[in-house]
């Protein structure tokens, strides 16, 4: 089963062995249409933006204005209506997928943890990349060379154990950390 979640932030457990935990809020969602392959079209709320295509979908599935995003998820529901979150109560482990924090155009030292050059005044090689090729042969830069460029904003998945799930407030507590900033939206999938 899959769910759309929002990252609240990190905290820790209080006890003899304190552990770092991540708090996620499971978004309230509505199942609009169920497909034959066990997946379903699910509507959920994210922001306030609505265009004509979304307005048409809201009218088609008779949804309120707040449900302005759609996703295809594996669900346990057998019929259209509220997304069933009861399966999270018995779940032990989930796969969490979030986008990492976007860091824009970054240099090689930040992006790939390169050492860089000496920091002394006489040096003119501080944070630069250095040599990027070989000799006359192959006479080109090899594909996959680690250079400066866009860093972050990549989809990352991790497997985390579930510490607890409060059905009332829809707060899921996971052991360890997950990628992304506080307030980011992602997906979780029950593994076992």
Curated annotation (Swiss-Prot):
Gene Ontology biological process terms from the UniProt entry: translation
Keywords: Ribonucleoprotein, Ribosomal protein, RNA-binding, rRNA-binding
Superkingdom of origin: Bacteria
Xref: InterPro entries: Ribosomal_uL3 (IPR000597), Ribosomal_uL3_bac/org-type (IPR019927), Transl_B-barrel_sf (IPR009000)
GO MF: rRNA binding; structural constituent of ribosome
One GO location term (cellular component): cytosolic large ribosomal subunit
Assembly description: Part of the 50S ribosomal subunit. Forms a cluster with proteins L14 and L19.
Family: Belongs to the universal ribosomal protein uL3 family.
Reported function: One of the primary rRNA binding proteins, it binds directly near the 3'-end of the 23S rRNA, where it nucleates assembly of the 50S subunit.
Name listed for the protein in its UniProt record: Large ribosomal subunit protein uL3
Organism, scientific name: Helicobacter hepaticus (strain ATCC 51449 / 3B1)
């Amino acid at each position: 089963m899959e769910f759309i979640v929002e990252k609240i932030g990190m905290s820790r457990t209080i006890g003899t062995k304190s552990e770092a935990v991540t708090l996620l809020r499971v978004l309230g969602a509505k199942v609009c249409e169920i497909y034959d392959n066990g997946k379903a079209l699910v509507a959920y709320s994210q922001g306030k933006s609505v265009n004509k295509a979304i307005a048409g979908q809201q009218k088609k599935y008779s949804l309120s204005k707040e449900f302005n995003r759609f996703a295809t998820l594996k669900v346990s529901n057998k019929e259209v209506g509220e997304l069933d979150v009861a399966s999270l109560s018995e779940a032990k482990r989930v796969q969490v997928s979030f986008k990492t924090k976007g860091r824009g155009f970054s240099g090689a030292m930040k992006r790939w943890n390169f050492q860089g050059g000496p920091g002394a005044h006489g040096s003119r090689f501080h944070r630069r990349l250095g040599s990027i090729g070989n000799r006359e042969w192959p006479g080109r830069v090899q594909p996959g060379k680690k250079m400066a460029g866009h860093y972050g904003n990549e989809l990352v998945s991790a497997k985390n154990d579930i510490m607890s799930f409060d059905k009332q407030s829809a707060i899921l507590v996971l052991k360890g950390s997950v990628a992304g900033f506080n307030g980011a939206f992602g997906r979780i999938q029950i593994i076992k």
